[in-house]
Amino acid sequence: MATHPLQSDERGFREPKLSVIPSGSFLMGSHCGQDNERPVHRVHLDSFCLAKTQVTNLDYSVFLAAVSAPPPPFWNDVRFSLPEQPVVGVSWFEALRYCQWLATVTRKIYRLPTEAEWEYAARGNVEGAAFPWGDSAPTAQPRYAHRWLTGPEIVGQSQPNPFGLFEMCENVHEWCGDWFDPDYYLNSPELNPQGPGSGERRASRGGSWRHHIKISRCAARSSIPPSFQYADYGFRVACSL
């Protein structure tokens, strides 16, 4: 697939708004979660940037036009077609291709975040909390209680976490760069873990608009094969410093 660099004022291109995530260490995983969230272990990460919001339909439309690619499934479905809704139906390969295109356009190192980066960023420097706001259940939060949705919401509507990130644990599941291994934490390196070297499924994080409980715990892990295209799967970009 060819790429065609754009100027920032051409055809609606806009570079993602990024939060700088400071270097630091945190306890990754959960003593109270699923087996694949254990053992809880110390991780240290170098500083990186993460997009404040999930990639939107508007952002993705510029990419499609630039590389002459067909749209993903659900593109014309009215439940998912607002410009500022997160793009859905994007496979891991397509999310990676978007990052590669964005890197070409901006001459920066755009990529998908690792699982460790995602969890660290979602926690917002709040050590050990189950959710971005603390440990109280989602059903106790006015935004999340007793809501039925037919699609994802416009990005940037939630209260941002301490790192200035929106919808980190909700709206759509977000692809990560790692392969997925349920036992990876048993031997994960402490410094900048990148995930296993191979696998059959790619890691993802975050909650989903179509679940009864629409927000996930910060430590909750998920995965699907990288070719799958679901209506509650999207992504946000990271950028190396």
Language-model features: where?
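Residue-level detector of short, conserved catalytic/binding motifs and their immediate flanks
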Residues: H41, F48, F163, R202, ...
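Generic detector of low-complexity/intrinsically disordered segments
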Residues: M1-T3, S8, V20, S47, ...
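Short, structured beta-strand segments at or near domain termini in extracellular proteins/domains
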Residues: A231-L241
